[in-house]
């Protein structure tokens, strides 16, 4: 089927689905028969990357599990943003959670890709936030060509990881050797910044991440946290502001302190069902800074959204290199290359 989300939705009306499995047979066929790069890129669904990049033959995704009640969903493969928002609204008493992919999911992906590519790079959700990278490492012990797989902790989430992945796509298409690709990714991991504004404290209080008493005091004082990802990949408080509007302006101010007015960098914005705030950030970034590539806007991964709630926005960018710019930076605008062309479905081929 071309719509696994609908199949799982209907099946879920008749009981709890104990296991879900989605394979992109078309992409597997293309990777096996039309691979035109030496390196494949693997991300998990906590990495928010534009669809046109996800469609490329050499880009593959391992889905994170999203859990509401007793039901588990495969993020992005069988759970669209619209359906996720619907579930997030309906489960008001019990917040949704996320769970790392099974080791077997990585094992199948790595085994398949190492059979068709010289090298495989997995850019994973921050290891300080999830066991996803650990699951990927466990999978390496189960495949023959483990030396062909590089596992890199993004120390980030959502569009923070997405910005790094976009550069990796460019380098792979440019035919760079795996050593240069790894070095470039590792450099960007250390320079990627993610700033998060949360207009409502409801999700933080409901999930227990913010105590009810402290949450009530914060609400009375109209205090809102700005969050960021630190150098270890942990979510930490960057600042406290009075009101959501002040939070938006503070993020622009923080970026200005890092880049300077008119500073050049890559940017991306994620949001939780709040396209308006995302467009506001894009306009302000274009006004005050010099985007090196197009600013992509995406729905935030459930890995962020389940914890922060509706209205959240996250802005990602690269800090300048200490040496005036990374030697790994690409010159393209991020649009090089083409997506995979249509190919016959070979149901019996690819990942089992």
Annotate each PLM feature.
Residues 1, 28, 34-40, 46-60, ...:
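Mixed-charge interfacial surface used for oligomerization/domain docking
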Residues 1-35, 197:
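Extended amphipathic alpha-helical scaffolds
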Residues 5, 104-107, 111, 248-256:
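Amphipathic, non-transmembrane alpha-helical secondary structure
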Residues 40-105:
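N-terminal glycine-rich anion-binding loop in soluble enzyme alpha/beta folds
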Residues 90-93, 97-138, 182, 189:
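Glycine-rich phosphate- or other oxyanion-binding loops that anchor nucleotides, phosphorylated ligands
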Residues 89-91, 117-122, 142-153, 297:
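Glycine/charged-rich beta-loop-alpha catalytic/anionic-binding loops adjacent to active sites
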Residues 16, 116-119, 263, 291:
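Short loop/turn motifs at secondary-structure junctions
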